[in-house]
Each structure stands twice: as structure tokens, then as C-alpha cells.
Curated annotation (Swiss-Prot):
SMART domains: IL1 (SM00125). It comes from Rattus norvegicus. GO terms for cellular component: cell surface; cytosol; extracellular space; nucleus. PROSITE patterns: INTERLEUKIN_1. Coiled coil: none annotated. This is Interleukin-1 alpha. It is found in: Nucleus; Cytoplasm; Secreted. Belongs to the IL-1 family. The modification N6-acetyllysine is found at residue 85. One of its GO terms (molecular function) is cytokine activity. Pfam families: IL1, IL1_propep. The similarity among the IL-1 precursors suggests that the amino ends of these proteins serve some as yet undefined function. Its main location: nucleus.
Length: 270
């Protein structure tokens, strides 16, 4: 008489084999971390204020950048995804590694970049090439004349009846060995040693007296350098010290630096 198979015994054996296999897999997973698991274990209090190297056996902080409204948000997160620190940086200004490390010290604040926008320009060396224009006059888009203000250290724009008061300029060309698309120049009041000097946004340009025409301009002296650009009959002078600002005028006001309207930033030269 043939033996009837014991179905319950087969199911029991199958269950036992699967249990052993499952136990082996569980044991393996407990003793081997995934290759992609950058960190594990709890985040210790003593490392919340420090940056540590990114190794698979250590807890680390990750810096993430999100771009929104011309801002950079830098976040430090734990291995559990919790945001520990957050800082905002201006997107259009440079920031350094020190700025990133500073995340660990403040919960949230706006970083004032340690490098001013013109700091890179200050590292350039401008060498005198030659004089390119002599005794020329500048008129703005309202056809106002440029003349020396009563304080003798500023320039002013207005419509003059006596054109003898109108300032004449000399222009000197320089070479920086940098961007060939830019044309660095200095502007000097003719027959004087007064050079036009940039002072900042909406601030009047200063007439700085220099004993002789500078042959080499570096560092803080880059306030004397302007990038001359000519488009058709319009001339523009962008400050090397303040790269987003140009020499500008308003109606009957001192010559200053501005980004554009309501100031006028184009000039006619004759």
C-alpha cells in the first residue's frame, strides 16, 4: 500500500528552511551596513558644533544649497534629516569656506560676505599704457555740463551759461593683464593733478590730488580705475572698485556712482 504524503510535514519543513534563510539574511544585514549608508548611530551632542569628515563610519553634516530670490540658503543636517543650522547668503556676492563653517555657530542669520564685491578687482595690477584723450568735455543725456563744485573736491552737473567753467578731462589707458574685453582708464581734470575717484553707491565722486600720474595702480587705489565702454555715441564709465556702479548724474546735482535710473549713466564726449 502506497504511503500518502504528509502535507503538513512538507509545509513544516518548508517553513523551517525559510526561517533559517530569513535568519541568515537578518544576521547578514545586522553585521554589514549598506554601501550607500553614509552614517549610522545617534548624533552625539558633542559633534553638533563641529564638521567631521564624510566617512561611512562617522556621523556627518551635509551642506545643501537652495536658490530662491537671489539668495543661497545653506543648511546643516543630521543623519536623520533634521535641520540643525541654517544660514542665508547673498547669491550675487562671493562667500568663503569660513562662511560655511560659521553655520555651526548661529541658528540662522544673514552672512555679510567677508569679501567685498570689489576685493577681487583690488588684487589686479593696472599698468599705465598711454594717454588716449586730452582736454575733452563730457555732457550727460540732458546735455548738462560737468564742472568743479564750489568745494573743489567734487564734480557737479548743470547747464552752464559760462562754458569756461566746464571741466576738461584727460583720459589715461591702463592694462591689467586680465579681461581683454574691458578698457581700464583714469580720468584727470586737465592741467591739474586731480583724478576722479569712486566712493560708493549714490556717493559723489571725489577729486583726489595725486602728485604725478600713477604708473601702477593696485589695491585700494583701484577707486581711480573706470572701465570705459562706448556704444554708438554714448560713453559709459563703470567703476573697477564697485563693478555694478557707473559714473552718473542727475539734474543739477553732484556727479556720483549709480546703477542706472533715476540717475543718468551715459555721456557724450567731445
Amino acid at each position: 500500500m502506497a504511503k500518502v504524503p504528509d502535507l503538513f510535514e512538507d509545509l513544516k519543513n518548508c517553513y523551517s528552511e525559510n526561517e533559517e534563510y530569513s535568519s541568515a539574511i537578518d544576521h547578514l544585514s545586522l553585521n554589514q551596513k549598506s554601501f550607500y549608508d553614509a552614517s549610522y548611530g545617534s548624533l552625539h551632542e558633542n559633534c553638533t558644533d563641529k564638521f567631521v569628515s564624510l566617512r561611512t563610519s562617522e556621523t556627518s553634516k551635509m551642506s545643501t544649497f537652495t536658490f530662491k530670490e537671489s539668495r543661497v540658503v545653506v543648511s546643516a543636517t543630521s543623519n536623520k534629516g533634521k535641520i540643525l543650522k541654517k544660514r542665508r547668503l547673498s547669491f550675487n556676492q562671493p562667500f568663503t569656506e569660513d562662511d560655511l563653517e560659521a553655520i555651526a555657530h548661529d541658528l540662522e542669520e544673514t552672512i555679510q560676505p567677508r569679501s567685498a564685491p570689489h576685493s577681487f578687482q583690488n588684487n589686479l595690477r593696472y599698468k599705465l599704457i598711454r594717454i588716449v584723450k586730452q582736454e575733452f568735455i563730457m555732457n550727460d543725456s540732458l546735455n548738462q555740463n560737468i564742472y568743479v563744485d564750489m568745494d573743489r573736491i567734487h564734480l557737479k552737473a548743470a547747464s552752464l551759461n559760462d562754458l569756461q567753467l566746464e571741466v576738461k578731462f584727460d583720459m589715461y589707458a591702463y592694462s591689467s593683464g586680465g579681461d581683454d574685453s574691458k578698457y581700464p582708464v583714469t580720468l584727470k581734470v586737465s592741467n591739474t593733478q586731480l583724478f576722479v575717484s569712486a566712493q560708493g553707491e549714490d556717493k559723489p565722486v571725489l577729486l583726489k590730488e595725486i602728485p604725478e600720474t600713477p604708473k601702477l595702480i593696485t589695491g585700494s587705489e583701484t577707486d581711480l580705475i573706470f572701465f570705459w565702454e562706448k556704444i554708438n555715441s554714448k560713453n559709459y564709465f563703470t567703476s573697477a572698485a564697485f563693478p555694478e556702479l557707473l559714473i552718473a548724474t542727475k539734474e543739477q546735482s553732484q556727479v556720483h556712482l549709480a546703477r542706472g535710473l533715476p540717475s543718468m549713466i551715459d555721456f557724450q564726449i567731445s
